[in-house]
Structure formats: structure tokens, C-alpha cells
């Protein structure tokens, strides 16, 4: 019995993957920028409520970290980490926005579900050039990830 539970625990640990660390955020999000500034923002209850309503999901807390990339004095864009549950385990994405607020890139930083549920580049690309709107969610402009043969794959 102990061996069985140890095998289950090992299987869950074995599927966890960290692809990038926080120290890589600047290079991933803003490879051509000469500086990246980090700002911690404490959201007011009203700001948090607006964000949660727009996103259709709850935030983990009121403190968010925003990374800002600059080329000289020109703001190139923003980046933020988004950690959430996939099924029962978490993933962390790095979402990069250009200066106008459109999605410039999305990176999987860490993924703790089995690899079959890992979003591929093709799926992450569905977010590219999109802005926050009611259509920017799974089931509308974004198709869900499926781990069966009917999904066209990444």
C-alpha cells in the first residue's frame, strides 16, 4: 500500500516541469530592450473586482507584479505572470503585452499537469495580437485544448 501511494506521489512530481525561472522573464519578454523595470501594484477592491469581472475568474490576491520593457525612454510593453489551475494542478504563464495592450507573446513558465495537457505553441498563438475583450476567453475566440485525436494539435 505504501508503495502504491509513493508511486502516485512520484508520478505527480515527475510530471511537474519548470521551463523558465523568474530570472529569465526580462530576456523572454523583452529581448531587444535595454532595461526592464518591475513594479508591484496593490489593487484596490474596485480594481480587483473590475479585473476579475473582465477575466471571468478570481485573482489569487490583490498584489500583482508588472514588468515594463524600455528601449531608451520608449515603453515597449508589459509582462505579467498568470498562475492558475488547469485541472487539479497549476500552470504559470508569462503574458507579454505591447505598449498598446495587445498580446505580443505567451510563454509557459511552469506546468504541473501531465504533459498531455500542456498548451502548444499553436494554441498559445491564438492569443497573439488580441486585446482584452469578452471574446478573449475559451469558448469564444479561443478554442479549448483537448487531449484527444479530434484536437488538431499544436
Question: Can you name each region flagged by the protein language model?
Answer:
Residues 2-92, 98-154:
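Intrinsically disordered terminal and processing segments
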Amino acid at each position: 500500500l505504501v508503495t502504491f501511494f509513493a508511486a502516485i506521489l512520484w508520478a505527480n512530481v515527475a510530471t511537474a516541469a519548470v521551463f523558465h525561472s523568474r530570472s529569465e522573464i526580462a530576456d523572454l519578454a523583452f529581448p531587444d530592450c535595454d532595461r526592464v523595470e518591475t513594479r508591484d501594484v496593490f489593487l484596490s477592491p474596485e480594481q480587483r473586482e473590475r479585473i476579475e469581472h473582465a477575466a471571468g475568474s478570481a485573482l489569487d490576491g490583490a498584489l500583482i507584479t508588472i514588468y515594463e520593457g524600455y528601449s531608451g525612454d520608449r515603453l515597449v510593453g508589459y509582462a505579467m505572470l498568470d498562475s492558475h489551475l488547469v485541472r487539479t494542478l497549476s500552470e504559470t504563464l508569462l503574458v507579454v503585452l505591447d505598449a498598446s495592450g495587445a498580446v505580443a507573446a505567451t510563454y509557459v513558465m511552469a506546468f504541473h499537469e501531465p504533459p498531455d495537457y500542456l498548451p502548444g505553441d499553436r494554441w498559445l498563438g491564438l492569443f497573439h495580437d488580441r486585446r482584452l475583450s469578452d471574446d478573449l476567453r475559451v469558448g469564444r475566440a479561443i478554442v479549448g485544448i483537448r487531449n484527444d485525436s479530434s484536437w488538431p494539435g499544436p
